Amino acid sequence: GTSGKLFSQSLDEAVWAIDAARAFLVASVEMTLQERLQIEKGFLRPCADLLLSSRDKGNWQVWHNGGIIALGVALKNDSIINAALNKPDLGYYDMQKKNVYNDGWWNEGSVVYHFYPLRAILLSAEAVRCRHINLYDEKVINMFLSPVNMLYSDLMFPSQNDGWYGTTLLEQAGLYEIVALRTGNQKIIDVL
């Protein structure tokens, strides 16, 4: 048997699982049934089980949930997706409630630590679209708008808390493009 574990920490498992699940969905149309089942049973499901048992209270859990969601979509398993969204204290919705202020700022207090979980949130929102779940709510839109209010004229952000200088909005343009496409929010479009 296999454990679905490839890395030394659950954060790396989750980040990698998101890309692996997406790649599986693309490649699976060219696979035989036996090949698909081997990957599902030998990696995808064990990795989902591993991430479902991982617990964190901050940005790691957001990535865990993103990995679980991506794996649930790849496995076409709504109960896995539901756990990632609704698990008490750990699910997507509780993480948003606990960690995102009303103005859209992530509670770790730096731009760097704001965009890190925001990328996982965006990947989660994209993954569940195929299950007719819309995570592009006001809180997510505010997460994209709030950093814009503190930009320097050169599109750089100030260094805050344990973040670092040199972080720029240009690095995040791809995320903003997706949110603009999905929401049609004029303020997001204006940022671009």
Residue spans of the language-model regions?
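Aromatic-lined, polymer-binding surfaces characteristic
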Residues: 1-151
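C-terminal, helix-dominated tail/subdomain
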Residues: 132-192
